[in-house]
Amino acid sequence: MKVVLTKDVEGWGTIGDVIEVKKGFARNYLIPRGLALELTEENKRFIDNILAQKARKLQREKEKAFELAKKLNGVEIEIERPIGVTGKMYGSVTTSDITEKLKEKELEVDKKKIMLRSPIRNLGSYNIQVKLHPEVSATIKVHVVPESK
């Protein structure tokens, strides 16, 4: 029996694939669980339409990411932190701190997209990568400076 997959099925294929399976497997497993539909012209068009919508949505997300990357590239932010008598910084700079500073510049970025291996614990300048989309990233410069009294 030929079916068209409505979801990714491990070992069988991805959404939109037309596969040949035994009738029992299709009727008792794939179709009741919503993983596949019996192959008809109408069902094939339905799945193709869903795939086209998904592709358009992914393209729009990628375009938005490119626009934001253009704005973010070259942005420099300054974060002040208190330092002790020995010159060591109290606390650290995290992705949340960077996100807040970007918001002040009217740039909305989810903190999960900021690629920071570990919190910044020293004063200095750092180039930080912001991964906006699997294919789009930007680099911002973060200056960690002593807090002015």
UniProtKB/Swiss-Prot annotation:
It holds the Pfam family Ribosomal_L9_C. Coiled coil: none annotated. The keyword Kinase does not apply. GO terms for cellular component: ribonucleoprotein complex; ribosome. InterPro entries: Ribosomal_bL9 (IPR000244), Ribosomal_bL9/RNase_H1_N (IPR009027), Ribosomal_bL9_bac/chp (IPR020594), Ribosomal_bL9_C (IPR020069), Ribosomal_bL9_C_sf (IPR036791), Ribosomal_bL9_N (IPR020070), Ribosomal_bL9_N_sf (IPR036935). Signal peptide: none annotated. Belongs to the bacterial ribosomal protein bL9 family. This is Large ribosomal subunit protein bL9. It comes from Sulfurihydrogenibium sp. (strain YO3AOP1).
